[in-house]
Amino acid sequence: MGLSDGEWQLVLHVWGKVEADLAGHGQDVLIRLFKAHPETLEKFDKFKHIKSEDEMKGSEDLKKHGBTVLTALGGILKKKGHHEAEIKPLAQSHATKHKIPIKYLEFISEAIIHVLZSKHPSBFGADVZGAMKRALELFRNDIAAKYKELGFQG
């Protein structure tokens, strides 16, 4: 279920807006994730003590991790579906070290969509949203396939 060239262009155009402030977008994505799905916070030893949104907004560690997450995702998106080399180590660490269920990747995908809608409404119409959702689904499906190869039932 790949994306067309036009869909990838839409995804990468809006991703250019994200790259202008990776740390800020990443922090917003993680805050959205943790607010919508508080159980996900337990997977982050560095952050699980943080309870309030104000604490999250003031956390440099959270901001740095948001930057790391979106930098990695941007590298994957730029491969336009040809991301085997990027997916393999990510799946390995998320399955064996962090034990992140696929469901949590769905949750963070929802958070990404929400943040893009709120920060870039004029650049995130239905066509762009649809393309981004498909790109994130492709990413999740490929991570899930690697999880299966690794014997992780996440």
UniProtKB/Swiss-Prot annotation:
It catalyses: Fe(III)-heme b-[protein] + nitric oxide + H2O = Fe(II)-heme b-[protein] + nitrite + 2 H(+); H2O2 + AH2 = A + 2 H2O. PROSITE patterns: GLOBIN. Nitrite binds at H65. Heme b binds at H94. It holds the Pfam family Globin. O2 binds at H65. Signal peptide: none annotated. It is found in: Cytoplasm, Sarcoplasm. One of its GO terms (biological process) is removal of superoxide radicals. The modification Phosphoserine is found at S4. GO terms for molecular function: heme binding; metal ion binding; nitrite reductase activity; oxygen binding; oxygen carrier activity; peroxidase activity. Its EC number is 1.7.-.-, 1.11.1.-. GO terms for cellular component: extracellular exosome; sarcoplasm. Belongs to the globin family. Monomeric. This is Myoglobin. It comes from Ondatra zibethicus.
